């Protein structure tokens, strides 16, 4: 961001009631893909910003913003749906254990191996109240798959929702370019006396223009 690599990049894939993807501008600042980093205090709730990837440890420059609302999350079945999915997946994992098919199964279904049995009630409540995409969290994934969360939209979700509502083609690619003019790193000051370096929502969303 400081080098201006994100300037005039695009939100290249938009899926309403799910997420908006952007920031595809080549390799990472390390010059190569870097490893996933999961934390049981950072979650893919609505407004969370996370690294896009194409598999384990393939993070580069692209990111996404979770856009799913609490209402959509509830309508999709919420925790009951995720728990049912996990019951099915963990049975398959047990069947594939110590099998050459396990690696292939994880590659295909890794993100869905979300161990709802290990998720604290406080985290479940967080998703119920805010929405988001819980199964993308790596901290509670049984096979170490997921997406690295590194920021949170604190202001401007109306802009995220507007981007998510843009007209797209059959592959969820916006018909008109949605341009990220720039991203700036600012110091976010909470109402308390503590401070933390973060990418604020203004840095991510407000400079973005639709059209």
Locate predicted features:
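Cyclophilin-like peptidyl-prolyl cis-trans isomerases
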Residues: 1-211
């Amino acid at each position: 961001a400081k080098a201006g690599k994100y300037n005039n990049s695009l939100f290249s894939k938009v899926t309403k009631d799910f997420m908006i993807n952007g920031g595809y501008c080549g390799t990472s600042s390390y010059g190569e893909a870097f490893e996933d980093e999961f934390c049981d205090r950072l979650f893919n709730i609505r407004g969370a910003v996370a690294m896009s990837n194409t598999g384990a440890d393939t993070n580069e420059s692209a990111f996404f913003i979770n856009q799913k609302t609490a209402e959509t999350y509830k309508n999709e079945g919420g925790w009951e749906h995720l728990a049912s999915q996990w019951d099915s997946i963990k049975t398959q994992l047990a069947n594939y254990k110590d099998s050459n098919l396990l690696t292939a199964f994880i590659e295909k279904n890794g993100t869905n191996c979300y161990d709802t049995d290990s998720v604290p009630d406080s985290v479940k409540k967080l998703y119920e109240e805010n929405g988001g995409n819980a199964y993308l969290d790596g901290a509670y994934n049984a096979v170490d798959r997921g997406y690295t969360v590194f920021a949170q939209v604190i202001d401007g979700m109306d802009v995220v929702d507007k981007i998510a509502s843009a007209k797209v083609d059959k592959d969820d690619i916006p018909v008109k370019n949605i341009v990220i003019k720039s991203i700036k790193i600012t110091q976010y000051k909470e109402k308390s006396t503590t401070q933390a370096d973060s990418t604020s929502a203004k840095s991510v969303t407000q400079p973005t223009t639709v059209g």
